[in-house]
């Protein structure tokens, strides 16, 4: 019950397509815990993770992912193959309208 890492999308700032919030958090949390496995951790994100971030979550063995808004274009659930670790619990969408509004505002300011 402790926040050990937080971030936001840094793709524009770092000019790096892999600098999604999830990727930043996985690195920070792993450094904090001194472990590449995050099986006792939960990830809370505003938008459904993309395929890249979901794939990275597989390798971290993250315990739970909670997301706010669906991502009908790039979300990992649009793929026929489940890319999450079998022990990862997924919860979402939750507070979808609020989260969609936050995402739209964030990206309109960045792009």
Question: Which residues fall in each region the model found?
Answer:
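Ser/Thr-centric signal marking residues that sit
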Residues: 18, 46, 88
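Short connector loops at helix/strand junctions that flank enzyme active sites
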Residues: 20, 38-40, 60-62
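A short, polar/charged loop-to-alpha-helix boundary motif
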Residues: 11-24
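Glycine/small-residue-rich phosphate/adenosyl-binding loop
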Residues: 5, 22-32
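Zinc-dependent deaminase
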Residues: 49-111
């Amino acid at each position: 019950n402790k926040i050990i890492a937080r971030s936001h999308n840094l793709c524009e700032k770092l000019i790096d397509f892999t600098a999604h919030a999830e990727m930043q958090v996985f690195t920070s949390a792993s450094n904090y815990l001194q472990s590449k496995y995050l099986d006792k951790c939960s990830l809370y994100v505003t938008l459904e993770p993309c395929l890249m971030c979901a794939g990275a979550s597989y390798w971290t063995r993250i315990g739970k992912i909670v997301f706010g808004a669906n991502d009908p274009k790039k979300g990992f659930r649009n793929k026929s193959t489940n890319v999450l670790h079998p022990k990862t619990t997924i919860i979402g969408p939750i507070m979808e309208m609020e989260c969609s509004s936050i995402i739209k505002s964030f990206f309109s300011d960045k792009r």
